[in-house]
Amino acid sequence: VLKSENGQILIKSSAAKSLVASTINSPSQKKKLISQNGVIKLVSNTGTLKAKNIKIDAGENGGVVSSGKIDVSSDNSKAGKIEVTGKEISIQSGSNILAKGAKGGGEILIGGDWQGKGNLLQATYATVEKNTLIDASSTKTGDGGKIVIWSDIKDQDSVTKVNGTLKAKSIDGAGGKIETSGAVINTDGIKVDASSQKGKGGLWLIDPYNYTIGDSEATTIKNQLNSGTNVSILTSQATSNSLSGSSGGYGDITVNTGLTLTGNNDATLTLNAARHITLNSGVKYLDTGSGKLSLAFIAGGNITQNTGGEIAIAKRIEAGKD
């Protein structure tokens, strides 16, 4: 256990000789991290790190592997900030990354900041395995915090894989915001919660080049909307120097599995495609709850409804009053 109750823990690969290994494989198992002066650096955390703020930096060619606990939570104030940076980041099964605060959730930035903004080093590979908990919730008062799992969307090799549990909840404030973004995204089995018990729901943002809503994605999105978490899928269009291959980086959103929503809480579903939105299966909103659902479909190209791709609303509609 490494603790610094009132200060900050900063781990850099150059200074953490006991935490440095010689090689690390990329998620594709086809490439390895680029060497830095002949050495591929790996920062590994298997224990507990506890401080007000924690930074783990493996450098632009290094990697971070964490299977332990990283904690900047506070029992009496707003939680702190966690930054984990490197070329490749792997948060392994059983890990706990916590920024829970009595007066507001903190920030957990893995592989980059929100939408890649700021000066934080951007990862090429960011992985959060199943049975991992990342939590930036508010535990008493205040808003939920911010969680970002990011890999550089401008890099054609960029992959973000998130299969664990992400929370940025609130009790009486607003829910927090959660982003899972990269050129290619895998969110199979992910669990997300940015809801609020008494306040406004938060946001889950998904930002790849292309995105397909299949069985797993539909279940996850449906659960978040029904719990009061807003979901926004924003695709970008690749340049000629970006993604290549048969799938392309066109900026399309495809709905292959239907979404059946009950409206238990107010929420908004936004599909914002740089190119086309294709509905091969529908979106149905049933009148079984007291909440309100807002739908926003925005496309730079076409919105196509194929057979079975209807939008059905079985809900009371009230006209505005003068």
Residue ranges of model-derived segments:
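Extracellular and secretory-pathway beta-repeat/beta-biased strand scaffolds
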Residues: 1-322
